């Protein structure tokens, strides 16, 4: 039986949180399909959501707009629910180049990808948790709307083992091969199995800490045990165990054979169409590529780019929605859309971009028309599949407001009593010199400044100018990858520099209590970067500081500025009245830097003899390393580990393997 959610927190709901929690729960229990939580920056929206999840005790999916915010939410939810299943589901590609064709230059680009094994394991763990238990929170990016293996086929492929079961060794090995596990008697790692006499060791694909030992007596399963794959130490016996497939995309052999016949029929029809239109090159290209794929599927059970035949493999009709993570979520599940003003448009935009690329591939004979059905969900399909939904944002979009029927649940008063920033409007003519003097005031009292510009060129020039005049400044732009971005933000918080200049990156999800001033240059240039929503989000970056202030440089007050200033002042007045009424003195937020960056850091694995006690000492010396330096250190330790293994010095190799595992967790956390 599944456990109930148990919320761990030293804090109790305060400010507007108790009322927001009550209204959200009331709405969900009354069957409302859509609700919007308008929570200002720093008001504890995540804590409110965690309380709702704990009280209603329903499996929950939280959608975040990007991997960085998803990791931050995952870390926070892990802290709130340490005894429950908090899972992480984002794209497992470190690098992904989709298959594409450029007709103008007759260039075909092969699919190329690099898969992050740790994230793949976390994805498998997420779907397993959704299938097995109800106390589950899955934090996902918009990767959740992309095709995933059919849950019905996935369930059918599972291998169920029970103590006393009659099954011979060959049958177990054959079933493991069907689940795409590979036999490796030398290197025991995730997704492999090994055989020693009548003992089969299986390393489940969704696990990174324990493995299963199956002990047979003739054709009977005599014992099932969980053990540590590194030390071989038995932990406990289990009466039954379910081995899940190594990948979400496993398909029974009979389904593959049936799909192959259907692909042959479509190929014949498509060839006739191409020949009728005198497209001889395209017809020859399509025949050659598809026949090769069919031969691979017949021999190996899969082929490169097998996802393009997913319609046949999952038994769907033309145009039907692909199975996604939403198909794994129970009907009474709960969906939380974080930063909904960004996430909702993303969901709507994924389908069309994917479709245009694939239409070119089909037109020029690289793929069959059925490849168009290997796609993300359309927005209307997402709406039909989504369970009861709570949209969470400081600036909800038009869609959320319409769906919620205008009944918005506000969370404006912060538990800390902090007020929204004061806003000043100053002229553009002297904006750079005025900004420089403000920076010097903030730097002198050890506070930080965020500056947002309109263009990349302006950001670069401003950074150079400020640097020449003695300011410690860095520039954040779109070419900087996620790992380096996190490193820059951490350095700002640590005081390595005082000013961070950016364009559109200084908005959602940046949690920096040290920032006391936000400067918005050319605030009167109406447009996407200076819309009401963008201005409120950017102003909100100073809302976590006791002396928070926003300066908008503009020679006139635009409609967006007027609305943003009006809304901020309305919130500030409400917060001030609440504080005065209850005698609350605002308190600054002293959030530890490690709290933000050590996202979802697992507890030490070592609980048995000879394990864990020495590792903490070995890895603490690397805690302060930057992501780049940490990556280099991991590579060095891996090289040493393999050297030890080649010299048959397995104890030293095992110790280094444990260190590498711990450092990888640390690297993922700060990425």
UniProtKB/Swiss-Prot annotation:
It is found in: Cytoplasm. GO terms for biological process: nucleotide-excision repair; SOS response. Keywords: ATP-binding, Cytoplasm, DNA damage, DNA excision, DNA repair, Excision nuclease, Helicase, Hydrolase, Nucleotide-binding, SOS response. A motif (Beta-hairpin) lies at residues 92-115. Residues 431-597 form the Helicase C-terminal domain. Its main location: cytoplasm. ATP binds at residues 39-46. Residues 26-183 form the Helicase ATP-binding domain. The keyword Nucleotide-binding applies. GO terms for molecular function: ATP binding; ATP hydrolysis activity; DNA binding; excinuclease ABC activity; helicase activity. GO terms for cellular component: cytoplasm; excinuclease repair complex. It comes from the Bacteria. Residues 631-666 form the UVR domain. Transmembrane segments: none annotated. The keyword Kinase does not apply. Pfam families: Helicase_C (PF00271), ResIII (PF04851), UVR (PF02151), UvrB (PF12344), UvrB_inter (PF17757). The beta-hairpin motif is involved in DNA binding. Belongs to the UvrB family. The UvrABC repair system catalyzes the recognition and processing of DNA lesions. A damage recognition complex composed of 2 UvrA and 2 UvrB subunits scans DNA for abnormalities. Upon binding of the UvrA(2)B(2) complex to a putative damaged site, the DNA wraps around one UvrB monomer. DNA wrap is dependent on ATP binding by UvrB and probably causes local melting of the DNA helix, facilitating insertion of UvrB beta-hairpin between the DNA strands. Then UvrB probes one DNA strand for the presence of a lesion. Forms a heterotetramer with UvrA during the search for lesions. Interacts with UvrC in an incision complex. This is UvrABC system protein B. It comes from Yersinia pseudotuberculosis serotype O:1b (strain IP 31758). The gene is uvrB.
